[in-house]
Design a protein with these regions (language model features):
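ABC-family P-loop ATPase nucleotide-binding domain
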Residues: 1-23, 233-246
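ABC family nucleotide-binding domain
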Residues: 12-227, 231
Length: 246
């Protein structure tokens, strides 16, 4: 078994970005997705990153989740400069320290939901018996233990999102990144999913919700607003250099 990294003490910055930029080459022109972002997120904090389409919020999520790298600037995760990590080390972080929940669920359609939840542990080399035990426990946390043998097509949208959350939780990550987690759900189901994230935050997970919906952002303790690749001043949270409250 590969142990999950120990969480940092509550209140300590687990995520720290300094002057982070991201530029994409678009043929004859360059697209500046992020422009000098400074951001601290404390261990155990619950935040929302909001902004319209094209604002840079998804790019920021990809960098925070180690799915992409900055063009310039520095990103430290739990005190370690991410730029110094090898591809293998980055893959280990994505598998063990960060849990991802996507709007589209990203479930394998021909695999049972138990098998879907097992996947991160398969990549980590966990044995079959332990994988199944932990996957069933994760499904139990989201109220779907009895659905373990079912296929994703046999579940509602809300249930599929719960499976995605169980998969994100199965390696006991300290950070949960959710990209528009209620975007495909009806209002009542969306409330239930957000209540689940509220519970996970209360348990000490660092929860980051990426959304354009202020009703979703209202569940976070702090709101970061992104406009044109920059953290914006104005109503909606602790903007400016986006450091956590003292």
């Amino acid at each position: 078994m590969t142990a999950a990294a120990a969480p940092m003490p509550a209140g300590m910055p687990v995520i720290s970005l300094r002057e982070v930029t991201k530029v994409y080459d678009s043929g004859d022109s360059a697209v500046h997705a992020l422009r000098g972002v400074d951001l601290d997120i404390a261990s155990g904090e619950s935040i929302a990153i909001i902004g319209p389409s094209g604002s840079g919020k998804s790019t920021l999520m990809h960098i925070v989740g180690c799915l992409d790298v900055p063009s310039s600037g520095e990103y430290e995760l739990a005190g370690t400069p991410v730029s110094r990590l090898s591809n293998r080390e980055l893959a280990r972080i994505r598998n063990q320290r960060i849990g991802f929940v996507f709007q589209a669920y990203n479930l394998l359609p021909r695999a049972s939901i138990l098998r879907n939840v097992e996947l991160p542990m398969m990549y980590a080399g966990v044995g079959r018996a332990e994988r199944q035990t932990r996957a069933r426990a994760a499904l139990g946390k989201v109220g779907l233990a009895e659905r373990a043998p079912h296929l994703p097509s046999q579940l509602s949208g809300g249930q599929r999102q719960r499976v995605a959350i169980a998969r994100a939780l199965v390696n006991n990550p300290s950070i949960l990144l959710a990209d528009e987690p209620t975007g495909n759900l009806d209002t009542q189901t969306g409330r239930e999913i957000l209540a689940l994230f509220d519970d996970l935050g209360a348990q000490g997970h660092t929860v980051i919700l990426v959304t354009h919906d202020m009703s979703v952002a209202a569940h976070a303790k702090r709101v970061i607003r992104i406009v044109d690749g920059r953290i914006a001043d104005g109503p909606g949270g602790d903007e400016g250099d986006a450091r956590p409250p003292a």
